Amino acid sequence: MAYADLLSFRAGTMVLTTAIAACLLLFAPSLRAVAQPDCRTIDDFAKATVGELPPDWKLRSDSGKNVYRVAEEPSLKFLHADAKGVGVQAAKEYEWDLGAYPMLVWSWRPLEFPKGGDERESKTNDSALAVYMLVPYSRVRGPKAVKYVWSEKVPVGTRLDSNMGLTQVRVLRSGAPEKKGQWVEERVNVLDDYKKFFDVKETPKPAGIAVLTDSDDTKSSAQGDYANFRVCRQ
């Protein structure tokens, strides 16, 4: 190959290499974006010990130490709740980017509704199942929370509040599932609900989630199961 031809060949190779590199740089951000997971697991209880409360779940009171424990069925571990005359939350710390992952997703099923439970009245405000998103607010008054409830009798879509307005409640389900023991998956846009319920525009930074199966107001008993907590992009 002549010297001039060699220079021309090398120059062409350099141009081609530069063009390829530029294309890679151009598409690199989109490749990284695609690699981001659509969902992040908060807890699927896969590594938890059956018969115990997972160590990273904390009880609001020691009176709830016998309420929550991990149970198992084929191919699934989950958090089982059995409340006998008590009402104690179990919470897990978990911070996430709510703007990027606005959807809160989980599965649940009621096994026993508290006798006479009606979340609209303070004297009967017990639920078989409730899930919270917690947002730091005050060391004295506690966090702000969006609470999702499976009620026995309160109509779906009902809006309630408690804790002097710091807890905003939305009834997601009402009545027994079609089949006893049937799991139901929920997908809620908790960011939209938070902004709407608290009438704010800014995106908060969640501190974690909580569950509550309670029967203290009705002095009865309640049971339910929770599984596969995660946050998703959509």
Describe the predicted segments one by one.
Residues 1-14:
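N-terminal secretory signal peptides that target proteins for export/translocation
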Residues 15-29:
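Bacterial N-terminal signal peptides
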Residues 111-182, 222-225:
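Extracellular ligand-binding interfaces
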Residues 93-104, 177-180:
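Extracellular/lumenal carbohydrate-interaction signature centered on repeated Trp-anchored short motifs
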Residues 66-89:
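Short carbohydrate-recognition loop motifs
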Residues 126-131, 166-167, 171-176, 180-220:
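Extracellular beta-strand ligand-recognition surfaces/modules
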Residues 45, 209, 227-231:
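Extracellular beta-strand elements of beta-rich domains used
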